[in-house]
Amino acid sequence: MKTLYSLRRFYPVETLFNGTLALAGRDQETTGFAWWAGNARLINLSGKLLGAHVAHAGLIVFWAGAMNLFEVAHFVPEKPMYEQGLILLPHLATLGWGVGPGGEVVDTFPYFVSGVLHLISSAVLGFGGIYHALLGPETLEESFPFFGYVWKDRNKMTTILGIHLILLGLGAFLLVFKALYFGGVYDTWAPGGGDVRRITNLTLSPSIIFGYLLKSPFGGEGWIVSVDDLEDIIGGHVWLGSICILGGIWHILTKPFAWARRAFVWSGEAYLSYSLGALSVFGFIACCFVWFNNTAYPSEFYGPTGPEASQAQAFTFLVRDQRLGANVGSAQGPTGLGKYLMRSPTGEIIFGGETMRFWDLRAPWLEPLRGPNGLDLSRLKKDIQPWQERRSAEYMTHAPLGSLNSVGGVATEINAVNYVSPRSWLATSHFVLGFFFFVGHLWHAGRARAAAAGFEKGIDRDFEPVLFMTPLN
């Protein structure tokens, strides 16, 4: 049966050149969308849309498992993770699997298990996706009303939202349980250079947890990205998990209020735009987190942050020149400021030279040398440990700088090595994805609002100016 043209006129339709590509219920004639419009053809086919999403999840999980095993197969335990271009194993190591003191990998078997579990899961999801895409019912409303839905049904939509929030909350609690009861997580701040430990003293004070949200995003404040101890991170996940679960229950039990019914557009494309907007925000936050934060993303696995590599260089040369007899407390640099040490705008003693701009840095290899007024001169003279020297020399030569052709390091460095920090990869990719998702959010929000208002933006093809122009030849 052909859909009435009046029901299809709100969709800009491209002509399908090859009419033989039609699939029953999924062709241009019935849906108003050509084959390349992807899931738009399935807007009103909940069963087929389920298949598309399950299959997509299968592809994602397959990538995770395959890439995980690829990284395990190429992993060299003697080299730091960040020197090997790894982006998945650092996450597993951060969760405390397979690592010991100082972030040294002692066992790769947990990484292998993770990869295999993801591959098996992807097979299950792949089978489910193919089943629902090809064999299962086209729509779920008749046979499985609990899983069926109509996009305009506001109550059902908020119920689905609630279920998703509960699942997200449970995900947050998985991290909490891992940190509290199942072996702990890697703490880069553990004495002597980092270790896996169980978190025993959670931060649950709302003034501390929500204080992060009220901080300025700039400079030494750094909003939530400034978190620098695991108690706060795990405590934050307790709060977040609880809020998500309670919010989920609320959305399942209630119907949207009148103001919410008026404020939102209630259509599939509108929900897509809201989701893309949220994911865009997540992408930008993740970008800042992986670039600046060395607690949630320990430098032992991801390499140093930019400020950390810079401060490490200043520290390394302070150590060298102090051994050669320099008085690091009073030596003057070429600008008349301190060559090795100077004062920050608020009076603390900080590293001098170009790295002064990064005086906010906190890092586990440096903090033991601070006193109440910044860097402590007597500690710098007497208390520097070999592990601190080794780590700063390592970080100094592995700054998160690099180009697309994988030649890492400062652009003017003639001895550049084949190194690009995982921080560079993860921060850049999440920024780019966040940007594209934001553009997608604007695109789909505009279309959804236009459809709700009863018109589509675009040129009326019947009166297109080009049709009245003389042919060029």
Swiss-Prot record:
Purpose of the protein: One of the components of the core complex of photosystem II (PSII). It binds chlorophyll and helps catalyze the primary light-induced photochemical processes of PSII. PSII is a light-driven water:plastoquinone oxidoreductase, using light energy to abstract electrons from H(2)O, generating O(2) and a proton gradient subsequently used for ATP formation.
SUPFAM superfamilies cross-referenced by the UniProt entry: Photosystem II antenna protein-like
Swiss-Prot/TrEMBL GO biological process terms: photosynthetic electron transport in photosystem II
Keyword set includes Acetylation: yes
Binding-site list for [CaMn4O5] cluster: E367
Keyword rRNA-binding: no
Phosphothreonine: residues carrying this PTM: T15
Signal peptide: none
Species assigned in the record: Nuphar advena
Membrane topology summary: Multi-pass membrane protein
Main subcellular localisation: plastid
Family per record: Belongs to the PsbB/PsbC family. PsbC subfamily.
UniProt cross-references to InterPro entries, sorted A to Z: PS_antenna-like, PS_II_antenna-like_sf, PSII_PsbC, PSII_PsbC_sf
Membrane-spanning parts: 69-93, 134-155, 178-200, 255-275, 291-312, 447-471
Protein name per the record: Photosystem II CP43 reaction center protein
GO MF annotations, alphabetized: chlorophyll binding; electron transporter, transferring electrons within the cyclic electron transport pathway of photosynthesis activity; metal ion binding
